[in-house]
A protein has these predicted regions:
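Membrane-embedded alpha-helical bundles that constitute the cytochrome b-like, heme-associated redox core
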Residues: 1-163
């Protein structure tokens, strides 16, 4: 692995660690909100449906996938900018995209993009149209189902050359 590829993988690793740390921070915050006294504690949760918790986790997942997409786009801008510096350096870095670990990463990134897209469309629909709790739950289930189905299909396409 060349020095440029090592630098690219190092920066990608730092970005992935920052996304994971952000995810841990967001999940920790959601758990603290869930267990706080302001939320009514366990007594307050007795009469409440679980939809509110599911919506909160969808919100956390939306934030985490947004952070992951932003981190990748930032890195991708820099790796495409290498073309202005030297085409050999650009080709050197882009050889990494054909490796099996990067194909797995691209597959996960594609699933993050799908979830972020479908959940974002769901949130826009919830803001624009005053739908009820049942419809909101169905929309979330639909966005998760679409993410799983389309994510599996795209993963097969992305991972096939690496297998």
């Amino acid at each position: 692995m060349s020095a440029l590829q090592t630098a690219f993988v190092s920066i990608l690793s730092v970005l992935l660690v920052s996304v994971v740390l952000f995810a841990v921070y967001a999940v920790r915050g959601a758990l603290l909100i869930r267990s706080s006294a302001a939320d009514g504690g366990w007594i307050g949760r007795i009469g409440r449906t679980r939809d509110r918790d599911v919506q909160r986790w969808a919100f956390v997942a939306h934030r985490v996938t947004g952070m992951a997409i932003f981190a990748f786009l930032t890195l991708h801008i820099f790796d495409v900018a290498l073309l202005a510096v030297s085409s050999s350096r650009f080709d050197n870095v882009h050889r990494l995209y054909g490796t099996a670990p990067m194909r797995v990463f691209e597959s996960l990134l594609c699933m993050a993009i799908l979830f972020h897209t479908f959940n974002g469309l769901r949130l826009v629909l919830l803001d624009v149209a005053d739908v009820g709790v049942v419809t909101a739950r169905r929309l979330l289930n639909g966005s998760v189902a679409l993410t799983i189905v389309l994510g599996a299909l795209t993963s097969v396409v992305i991972l096939r050359p690496a297998i």
